[in-house]
Amino acid sequence: MRRRSPGKTHLPRKILLAATVLIWLGAFQRVSGQSFFTLVPCRLEVICLLPPEFDTSNDLEHEFCDQLAERLASEQGPAWRVSVAPPSLEDRAILRAALRRDLNFDPPTSWRKLALRDKVAVVAVRRSGLGWHILARDWDVRVERLGPLVEKTVPTWSDVPEAAAESVRQALVPVARIRLVEQQAVRLDLQGSLLMAERPTLPGRLFLTLARYEDRDGNARAVVPLPWTILQSPEGPPAEDGSVSCQVISGLKNPLSARRRGRVQLLAWAVTPQVRPVTISLKNRQAPQNPLVGYEVLAQPGGEGSPQFLGRTDFAGQVEVPAEDPPGWKLLWVRHGRRVLAKVPLVDGSNEFTELALPDDDPRLLAEGYLMSVQDQLVDLVTLRSVLIARLRARIANGDWDQAIRLRDQLLQLKSREIFSSELTQQQQRLLCPDPVGQKQIDKMFEETRRLVNLYLNPREVEELVKEIAMKAPRRSDTP
């Protein structure tokens, strides 16, 4: 009986193993460009708060929950893992608080455990005069935020399950992980996007940016929104890897690429603009952080076109920013004198960021006003000086020495370059700005004014005319 060589026996296995590794690496390379987040289904826990008459009938309550779960599961398939259940007795007060408007919601500790769920959707069904009123709201465990409240009214009970499912779908706020691509461009990896039957399209959608700081167990130590930074997705379909490209719009320099210690996730939370005004407050960056009064606020809708003047801050440092119709986002300009202090994005109707800390620009504005008056004086002086020099040359050419001497004396009595420079130096020493950028601009404005003074008040031309008169004019006799 012939025996095979051990090397030949294991050779096909090695080839098969190598091929398997190559295939796995190829698949890993395709996925590693994005995040595995796109392959992870969203664990959605729906809690139904039904009318009191359902408390006496567990069958009706469970039947409604089963119908709702079936409708939600059929919508996204493997992208969602849905569980629907009625609340416990102790959870009812918490659920009612989650459905109130404009309330600081303090969720139970279990709602902050990312190991248990990704989202909690609260649904309440109530009787109304027109039939049945449905409310739904999303609590996202990853960003620890409540979404907007969704409300619907249907006439009959048979319409409630479908309306409740639609309310939940509308209430769920998209959350994504941010993947840095370029300094002003990122990609968003939406949870479970590669598991969806249809890739999500988010044309022109706006996102707030947040940093989630985690402990060793994956629980959030803090979820901090990045101030004055939004993301905007372009028109068009998503990429093949399920990600969505976005433009970074921020009033900060490199807001996403800053170094952060520990386990940190950069997340995007979709926000919907609203048609309602927002009041912006400006305050001094340095203690005691007094309000900044009289600062101009301008707006560029969509960041395009010429800035439109909105108003000046009042005694409290506040100004109201109206919303556009249809609502979107705008780029706010804060200007003081001729200096633009900030350009920050604002989503219409969003009260996420309403306070902007800026350097006190009053010393720089005082310097600007003073130097503008100095330049006005300089223009008047140069004009008068030029007229006197022209007349003096004409009198010298005609030999009218009496008039020439009178014009010479008028020229010598004008403010000289040295006096201008001395006044500028004294005033510059008095104007000190606590803001380094503002102080740098003050110094630059003074240097520019000195350059103009030295350029247009050159004494050489006047000195030459004085010498010419001294040489050519007849000397007056001291005796009659």
Question: Whereabouts are the PLM-identified features?
Answer:
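Beta-strand/loop-dominated core regions that host nucleotide or nucleotide-derived cofactor-binding catalytic loops
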Residues: 149-153, 157, 161-195, 201, ...
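Bacterial N-terminal signal peptides that target proteins for export
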Residues: 2-17
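Bacterial N-terminal signal peptides
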Residues: 17-27
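Conserved, compact domain cores that house catalytic/ligand-binding motifs in diverse enzymes
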Residues: 283-316, 320-329, 371-466
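Short beta-strand elements
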Residues: 343-367
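N-terminal segment of the mature soluble domain
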Residues: 56-108, 388, 407-411, 421-426
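Amphipathic beta-strand/beta-sheet edge segments enriched in Tyr/Trp
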Residues: 115-158, 243, 331
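A structural "domain/chain start" motif
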Residues: 33-75, 284-288, 360, 364-382, ...
